[in-house]
């Protein structure tokens, strides 16, 4: 069993929980050399990132949604089930909260979990390919002009965008930046590419969902936007550069502890985003008698 940890948060207590569980089930627990060294984790086998990706039968990602996405990219060449454990804010993609880790591990051991398949975006730029399980974003940089791009679908011109940001999202990523820009929520079990402009000035002004067999090509015609994959800045784009985006089926495997409640959890979390408070302030909205019930 491999561990992928948030690069800054101290998840040592959770690592101890996982280590105790693996030791009682005769499972070897491994992590990257960097994580083992950074947190001085005893009893873990330290592997290179390449060894971790090629030898694990499963991954537990401790952190937030970004940690989970990184774990899925890590094993995308040989997909294995990934369990996301949230130690961040709302955690749309992570399956369980940190406080529920022990219960989740018990259910996995008892065979009371399932695995769902996820597709991803294959992004071509500059002669190389990268993967994105959430989204690809071309974002306006102050002083560099708006994002201007022509979109072609299956080799045919589709339309033009002029906006502050252009987001190409997977269905799983439809609850992230695309949703904040007014895009729809798409069932994560759907195959397809969601294209959403943020603050469009002219051109296409609405989200469109394109099929998995419709490769996309973006040609930048203006601006010098930042180029992000799954929230990670990878560089800047110049006018005349192109980005291709295609769909890859079954690129990742997600562990579900209670799949029947996944839609309910997402709906509640999306509703919380509409409240004018920070996630840490949400508890203040809960009546005191209900809070006492939670504490018991």
Place the predicted regions along the sequence by residue:
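Redox-cofactor binding/interface segments in oxidoreductases and associated redox assembly factors
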Residues: 3, 61, 168
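Catalytic core of DAGKc-family lipid kinases
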Residues: 88-165
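Gly/Ser/Thr-rich active-site loops/lids in small-molecule metabolic enzymes
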Residues: 146, 156-204
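Proline-centered loop/turn at the N-terminus of a beta-strand
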Residues: 28, 79-83
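ATP/NTP phosphate-donor binding region
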Residues: 1-58, 70, 99-114, 125-129
């Amino acid at each position: 069993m491999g561990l992928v940890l948030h690069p800054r948060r101290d998840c040592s207590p959770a690592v101890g929980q996982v280590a105790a569980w693996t030791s009682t089930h005769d499972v070897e627990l491994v992590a990257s050399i960097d994580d083992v060294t950074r947190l001085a984790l005893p009893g873990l086998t330290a592997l290179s990132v390449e060894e971790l990706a090629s030898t694990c039968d499963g991954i537990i990602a401790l952190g937030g949604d970004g940690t989970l996405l990184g774990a899925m990219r890590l094993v995308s060449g040989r997909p294995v089930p990934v369990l996301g454990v949230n130690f961040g804010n709302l955690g749309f993609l992570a399956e369980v909260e940190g406080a529920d880790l022990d219960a989740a591990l018990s259910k996995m051991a008892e065979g009371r979990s399932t695995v769902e398949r996820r597709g991803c975006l294959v992004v071509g730029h500059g002669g190389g390919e990268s993967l994105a399980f959430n989204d690809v974003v071309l974002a306006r940089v102050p002083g560099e002009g708006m994002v201007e791009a022509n979109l072609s679908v299956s080799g045919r011109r589709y339309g033009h965008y002029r906006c502050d940001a252009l987001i190409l999202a997977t269905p799983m990523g439809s609850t992230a930046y695309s949703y904040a820009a007014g895009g729809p929520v798409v069932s994560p079990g759907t195959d397809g590419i969601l294209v959403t402009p943020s603050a469009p000035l002219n051109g296409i002004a609405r989200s469109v969902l394109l099929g998995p067999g419709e490769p996309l090509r973006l040609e930048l015609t203006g601006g010098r936007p930042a180029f992000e994959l799954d929230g990670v800045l990878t560089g800047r784009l110049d006018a005349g550069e192109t980005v291709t985006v295609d769909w890859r089926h079954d690129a990742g495997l997600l562990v579900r502890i209670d799949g029947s409640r996944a839609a309910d959890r997402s709906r509640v979390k999306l509703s919380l985003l509409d409240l004018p408070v920070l996630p840490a302030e949400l508890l203040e909205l809960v009546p005191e008698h209900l809070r006492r019930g939670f504490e018991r």
